[in-house]
Amino acid sequence: MGLVDLHTGLGPWGHGELISHEGANDAGYRRGTDWWGDVRSMVDGESVSAALSGDWLGALDELLPHVEITAVALEFGTVDVVSVLQALRADAVLHAHGDARGPDAPAVRAQVRAAFADDDPAWFDAVSAR
């Protein structure tokens, strides 16, 4: 089974990076490179993503033990990483200490949207081409 999990926020603007949760010596990583070409490993430090544990792609092998799974995330870059982190922080603060329907909420939602979905038609074209 092949699975592509779409993400936005990290990496160069409009570039789509295929990211494996497995290392270069793992069968799933090798199948991914056979199927899709240039796959980067978060485990080996090759990708725009930090190495994560507990991600759902990694859990698939346990959930479906009799299925050969080849899973990657496809991460499209939007804005610089500091802007992404600031948007995530603003959203977390709003939900932990603010009012999701209060006067600050629309600005925070706009900040999060700007960090994860560029409205520029050229960005959409780059994402669609990938």
Walk through the language-model features, giving the residues of each.
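C-terminal accessory segments enriched in acidic
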Residues: M1-R130
